[in-house]
Amino acid sequence: SVLNAIRTGYRLIDTAAVYDNEDAVGEAVREAIAEGLCTREALFITSKLWVQDMANTGMAKAGIAASLKKSGLEYFDLYLLHQAMGDYFSAWRALEEAYEAGTLKAIGVSNFYPHVLANFCETVRIKPMVNQVELHPYFAQPAALEAMKHYHVQPEAWAPLGGGRHNPYQDALLRGIADAH
């Protein structure tokens, strides 16, 4: 559970509208604060706008508002477009407005391929601060990293150890690195 994760020291919590757990995340955050485990400011909470809310700016605004309401939070530390689908340019305008209003402290994208990210960054008013992508020792994505570097977009890895598909704990090279550090 999220509350137990906070109890053990986790401070970054990643959720999304499509995960259908924003309400549970918000509840765990409120419980952790009530128990004196942390302050809201000590946590970094990310959520994501799903594609059904990316048809236009109005739907994206409603999606952001719904995420905030479900979670019971006043703001998200980071809010992402979950994928480059739908009218993600119009949806981005809603993120820009919420960022400027302070309800989204940082805004970014997720799963944007290098050519999509490049076109996006050349077009939008506020560049994404993060691109959350699959990134791990078995899928290094050098072209994606180069595009992010060029546009000053911070990469954030999902499945940073390979998502369990690659058995990284049995990988001799990774075990050697772990043992050395």
Regions flagged by a language model, labelled:
Residues 83-181:
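Beta/alpha (TIM)-barrel catalytic core signal, keyed to glycine-rich beta->alpha loops juxtaposed to Asp/Glu
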Residues 24-34, 64-68, 95-96, 117-118:
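Short, well-ordered amphipathic alpha-helices
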Residues 1-43, 61, 161:
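N-terminal binding-site loop/beta-alpha segment at the start of enzyme catalytic domains
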Residues 59-80, 97-101:
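CE4/NodB-like, metal-dependent polysaccharide N-deacetylase domain
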